[in-house]
Amino acid sequence: MSNWLDTLADVKRVGYGDKAQFHVKQEGIRAYIQAKGSTTARSKVASKTFSLDDTLSVSARPVVNLVELQTNQVAMADLIRDAAYQMELAELAYIQKVLNDAIETWEKPYYAEGTGVVKATLDPMVRHWVRMSGGQAPALFGDIEMTSKLAELTGFNGQYADQLIVEQNNAGVIGTYLGSKVVNLINPLIDHSDVPTFDCNKLYLVPGFVDASMRPLKVVYEGDVTSTEATHIDDLTYEVRLDQYFNAAVVVGDRPYIGVYRDTNN
């Protein structure tokens, strides 16, 4: 449905009753300079294990008239597909809230905000991750509401370079900014509304040297989607209940291996 979760989260899928184990990077080994023969301070183990023990349940329960079902006026497969989609939306809304609650406690260069996309604020955040990665710029990932504003920060006033004009016209965004690849968030609208699924006012800085296990957003899915069905003779209805167990948490070790810029205008 979207590239949001795969881009920002460390996701594990376990069987029923199993616990997801996440390894969180800690401060790691340090080196010290001292007089010859002196005792060197010890370095702590470079990672710890975090377990998401408790899971939550997201459920949906579509009901259909039995006669309509038997006469093929309603396709149960379509109802189940719609129910599963609504469950996924509910899960993602919860996971996004978990992340949002955490990131607003972070400080620069991992979290910053401004009125619009402020070059003087965003650029130091990009440079931080370039240094962290040994020269590799982070990806800039966000809704087109944010990524489309990056062209204005390129330093061209009144007249853009031809390449930027072509990129902006073809994709709605420029391809790179300060060496960072600009990636559009796939942000579908919630059914029967004009409300996007994910925040439109955040630009995520995703460092390329970080694998999924280092991301602070941890998500676990316990088992597959289960279904239970029943037929009711009193009102001639048929129903299916779908359940999925999941949970999310933000766990920060030595640092949050992601950056977030928020536009306070939106």
Language-model features and meaning:
Residues 23, 51-53, 61-63, 141, ...:
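Residues in well-ordered beta-strands of folded domains
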Residues 103-174:
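Extended, solvent-exposed, turn-rich assembly/linker loops in the middle of proteins
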Residues 56, 134, 234-236:
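A short, structural micro-pattern
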Residues 156-266:
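Sequence/fold signature of self-assembling virion shell proteins
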Residues 4-10, 85, 188-198:
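N-terminal short leaders/motifs
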Residues 59-133:
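Alpha-helical scaffold segments that mediate packing/assembly in large oligomeric complexes
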Residues 89, 93, 146-148, 246-248:
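Short loop/turn segments at secondary-structure transitions that flank enzyme active sites
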Residues 1-58:
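Assembly/oligomerization interface modules of large self-assembling protein complexes
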